[in-house]
């Protein structure tokens, strides 16, 4: 049956099949080949020009977007054909695939499109590049390294396939991890080395500061016995009898320095003596505990004697006795035991002979002068201060030749003499402190009332 003549009528322009296949292919975005150039298929290039007299091959209307211009590249002049061109209705013969002989692409961001994420996923360039049959699919891989690089843990790799229709979700890297474990380890090593250098700088600064302060402390400790004797004597010369009688605080300040020096020195001697191991023989054990008990008693009496002697009312004789005589009694024995004797179990020896014997003799003379007459009080302070000053000068400038005694008996005699002098002095101080406290607080009467009395027969 013959077809009607209506099929020869021209097709309206708003018909969906108005544009031919060549026009539709011309409106598609250009493709890319292996060389990175944009080239249309030969079928589209052959039918891109409209032929006169054919209404179906007219140029596109104003509503259709114009074709994009071809971008120039460094491989513009190379001859390349696609391996699988689209079939053309007018060209029935199929072209054999031709392998491209283009030079290798220049290394850059376009040479490795599968290693970098696309900056604009919706662009036609990214879509056509991913759709090209000659390039592998663009796969974005993210490497996640363990938090503890020291442990032997294999890195887990998560691959996320990117589609040309779905947008890419960019995940920023963690600031605490790096993509290279060697870089991470070097960063940690630099941090540790910087911290160690800072700690070493602090330790060096502290050691240098301690080394600078050590001579100052040594100077203060050297002049402490001399100042402990002369300071109360100067206070006695500055203030009169009435000032000491009215002000207990002035009496406390006058006695604080000599008693504090003796208490500190005996406490240090007791600590150093107790730090050594206890000897095994019976004789050494007896000496060890006896000397420990004496040093501890001297420390306690020196601390407790400050308050009773400050509370006592000083008359004319007491205003000379407490500031002048007491420091000359308490300071020299403590100074001798701390500076001139090496108190170690089984190794007790005298380090300085001449000045130590002189100080011991001067202390005995002071005791004899004090108990004889009141007018000899100032001489005790003068003799003690001069002997201590000579000891300090001999240690600093070597005025006297320091040589130990020839025999062990002489060394033991000097040590025993010093200990006997210290025992007499601190026994007198302890008795005086108890007497003053009993006079003020009547301690003995209260103790007698508390203790049970014997029944009368």
Curated annotation (Swiss-Prot):
Residues 74-94 have a biased composition (Basic and acidic residues). Pfam families: DUF2463 (PF09591). It comes from the Eukaryota. Residues 102-112 have a biased composition (Pro residues). Residues 1-112, 157-183 are annotated as: Disordered. Belongs to the UPF0328 family. This is UPF0328 protein ECU05_0030. It comes from Encephalitozoon cuniculi (strain GB-M1).
């Amino acid at each position: 049956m013959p077809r009607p003549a209506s099929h020869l009528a021209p097709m309206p322009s708003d018909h969906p099949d108005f544009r031919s296949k060549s026009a539709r292919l011309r409106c598609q975005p250009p493709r890319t080949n292996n060389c990175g150039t944009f080239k249309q298929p030969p079928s589209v290039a052959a039918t891109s020009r409209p032929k006169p007299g054919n209404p179906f091959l007219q140029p596109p209307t104003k509503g259709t977007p114009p074709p994009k211009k071809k971008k120039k590249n460094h491989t513009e002049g190379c001859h390349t054909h696609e391996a699988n061109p689209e079939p053309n209705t007018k060209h029935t013969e199929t072209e054999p695939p031709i392998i491209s002989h283009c030079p290798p692409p220049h290394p850059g961001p376009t040479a490795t499109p599968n290693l970098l994420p696309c900056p604009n996923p919706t662009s036609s360039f990214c879509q056509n590049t991913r759709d090209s049959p000659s390039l592998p699919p663009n796969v974005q891989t993210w490497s996640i390294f363990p938090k503890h690089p020291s442990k032997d843990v294999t890195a887990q790799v998560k691959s996320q396939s990117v589609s040309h229709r779905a947008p890419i979700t960019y995940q920023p890297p963690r600031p605490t991890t790096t993509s290279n474990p060697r870089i991470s380890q070097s960063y940690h090593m630099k941090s540790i080395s910087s911290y160690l250098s800072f700690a070493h700088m602090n330790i060096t600064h502290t050691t240098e500061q301690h080394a600078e302060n050590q001579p100052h402390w040594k100077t203060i400790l050297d002049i402490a016995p001399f100042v402990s004797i002369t300071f109360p004597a100067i206070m006695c010369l500055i203030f009169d009898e009435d000032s000491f009688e009215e002000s207990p605080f002035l009496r406390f300040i006058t006695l604080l320095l000599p008693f504090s020096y003796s208490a500190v020195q005996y406490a240090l001697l007791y600590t150093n003596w107790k730090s050594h191991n206890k000897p095994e023989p019976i004789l050494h054990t007896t000496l060890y505990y006896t000397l420990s008990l004496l040093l501890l008693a001297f420390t306690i009496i020196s601390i407790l004697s400050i308050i009773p002697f400050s509370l006592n009312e000083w008359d004319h004789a007491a205003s000379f006795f407490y500031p002048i005589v007491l420091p000359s009694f308490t300071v020299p024995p403590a100074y001798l035991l701390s500076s001139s004797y090496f108190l170690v179990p089984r190794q007790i020896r005298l380090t300085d002979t001449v000045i130590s014997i002189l100080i011991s003799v001067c202390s005995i003379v002071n005791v004899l002068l004090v108990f004889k007459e009141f007018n000899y009080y100032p001489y005790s302070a003068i003799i003690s201060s001069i002997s201590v000053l000579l000891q300090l000068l001999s240690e600093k400038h070597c005025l006297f030749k320091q040589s130990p005694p020839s025999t062990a008996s002489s060394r033991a005699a000097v040590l025993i003499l010093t200990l006997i002098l210290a025992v007499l002095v601190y026994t007198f101080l302890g008795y005086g402190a108890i007497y003053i406290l009993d006079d003020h607080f009547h301690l003995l009467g209260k103790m007698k009332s508390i203790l049970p009395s014997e029944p009368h027969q």
